[in-house]
Amino acid sequence: MPESQRQPYFVLVRPQMGENIGASARAMWNFGLEQMRVVAPRDGWPSTRAVAMASGAGRLLDTAQHFDGVSQAVGDTSFVFATTARGRGLTKPILAPEEAMRQAAEKIAQGQKVAVLFGPERAGLENEDIAGANALISVPVNPDFPSLNLAQCVLLMAYEWRRAQGQVELARMELAKTQWAEAIEVEKLAQHYEERLEDAGFFFPQAKAPGM
């Protein structure tokens, strides 16, 4: 199975600006995601503004699928996540991005097709869009300013997807034009310093030398 088919579909629902579609494509491609679907973009499709903003990620726009409605966009998928910034009073699981993408990875590994819905910039997804979703994704943002730009939300989900794939290093050490010393080399260096310090009279009084 091609790598692109082992990924979730990121579905942009009624995006209002071509620039945000292009920025979302860049965010997806930053983390190796290729499957974009676009539902009823306000400014039409294809979008020259999206292409201009996508820069090196234009390939995603070339292969992006266009749909008239959400139900058509997710019709071939078996599990749908919907992103939301506020509670909807619906009886659905509400997951943090990390857990949602972990579950998405598990389902895709089992052969399921998974979609993630992203709403319009101004007000987000409508309840009608969310009704058919299996679970909601809620980002723990500042409650006094919960609004995320479309591309920001896409970037966050794409990053968590990559983490779920085990492709994010939590820490590393880079050695600039050098390599790790062997234990014997470290020991010899310590002996060298000790000899030089002793020659300089650093270990005084001599009785305290072993503890210094």
What do the PLM-derived regions correspond to, one by one?
Residues 1-212:
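Post-transcriptional modification and biogenesis factors for structured RNAs
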